[in-house]
Amino acid sequence: RPEMIPYGACYGDALYVSAVLKYYTGTIAADGKPTTPSGGGSGSKSGVKVIEAGETLIGKTRYVFGGGRSQSDINAGRFDCSSFVRWAFEQVGVNVGPLSGVTTDTLKIQGQAINPKDMKPGDVVFFDTYKKDGHVGIYVGDNKFLGCQGKTGVAIASMEKGTYFGDKFNGRVKRF
């Protein structure tokens, strides 16, 4: 889809490999085997890369409950909150589960639990919306998160007390 190349290339585009490799931080050990980047996918330099990857979709998506679980949905910019988080981490080489099966429930059991006072950009934050842990996003700092929301698609939203998501934040923070 040539019209998508300006947005960082989509799977199947000529520039896809280059677009993905700019986020890859893996190394090769002395024995010649690949190693996993240290520091995980969030709360580190990789956390900033996850945010940068996610920000490329701001204004280019729409929220569809259950969306983002097929390549055609992704190509069309249809995501829900959990599929967006999965997509952003996938862009930096962090696998948080299969494309077809990601939910807030599968994301909340992964990674390391972090005290909300210790949140860093790239950490994953959860909200009690229509159910416990019903919404998820990526913390960007300054009490804000990047997520795919119903009215905005992918956007940055406030977690300040007194705002919708600020009042729904349940304190669950995970670092992948």
Question: Where in this protein do the model-derived segments appear?
Answer:
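Sec/Tat-exported extracytoplasmic proteins
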Residues: 1-2, 20, 24-31, 54-62, ...
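Extracytoplasmic/secreted proteins, especially bacterial periplasmic and envelope-associated proteins
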Residues: 12-23, 46-53, 80-87, 91, ...
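Structural signal for conserved beta-strand scaffold positions within catalytic alpha/beta enzyme cores
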Residues: 56, 65, 147, 158, ...
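Catalytic cysteine-centered active-site loop
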Residues: 62-121, 155-157, 166-170
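Catalytic Cys-His active-site segments of thiol-dependent hydrolases/isopeptidases
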Residues: 97-102, 138-163
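A generic structural signal for residues embedded in beta-strands
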Residues: 126-127
